[in-house]
Design a protein with these regions (language model features):
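Short amphipathic alpha-helical segments that mediate assembly, nucleic-acid/protein binding
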Residues: 1-8, 21-26, 30, 57-64, ...
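Compositionally biased, intrinsically disordered low-complexity regions enriched in proline and serine
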Residues: 4, 9, 19, 26, ...
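Polar low-complexity intrinsically disordered regions enriched in Ser/Thr and small residues
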Residues: 14, 38, 44, 50, ...
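Amphipathic alpha-helical binding modules
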Residues: 91-144
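Short terminal alpha-helical segments
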Residues: 1-51
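Amphipathic protein-protein interaction modules
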Residues: 56-112
């Protein structure tokens, strides 16, 4: 359980940094993310394992957006995030391109999914229902089909 909390804290910390438009690209490509990924046991495999299962979603936002709900393996997703980050840190011609809309969106989507997988689902209602109102706009004339 402690590991899941660490992964959740990592995901929320970094998704906040990627969402913040004032974040300098140096803060995103510096070694701190690598340190966090390695501490959690994520592997830098250039995205090969993730690509085998999800194709171009390893680097393309539109592709990832289509399959993100199918991703349930925390270590696989974490390794994909680490590998994508490493691309910008080491191989990209311009590391500042990590700030481009599509690249930033890829990280936000992947890190958000990692946060959901490792933490409590914020969309599940917990508590006691006090009142409910159901409204239907379905009009029917005659017997139900």
């Amino acid at each position: 359980m402690e590991y899941l909390k660490q992964v959740h804290d990592f995901a929320t910390k970094w998704v906040d940094k990627f969402r913040d438009q004032k974040t300098n690209y140096i803060e995103l490509v510096d070694h701190y993310m690598a340190d966090d990924c390695e501490a959690l046991g994520f592997q830098m495999d250039c995205g090969h394992a993730f690509s085998e299962k999800y194709g171009n979603a390893a680097s393309k936002y539109d592709e990832l957006n289509q399959v993100i709900d199918e991703v349930t393996d925390i270590s696989l997703l974490g390794s994909a995030i680490y590998s994508q980050w490493r691309y910008f840190n080491h191989w990209a011609y311009d590391a500042a391109s990590i700030l481009e809309f599509e690249n930033r969106s890829w990280f936000i989507l992947a890190l958000s999914r990692l946060a959901v997988l490792s933490g409590e689902n914020p969309f599940i209602f917990t508590g006691e229902l006090e009142k409910i109102r159901i409204v239907s706009n379905r009009l029917g004339y005659g017997p139900c089909p």
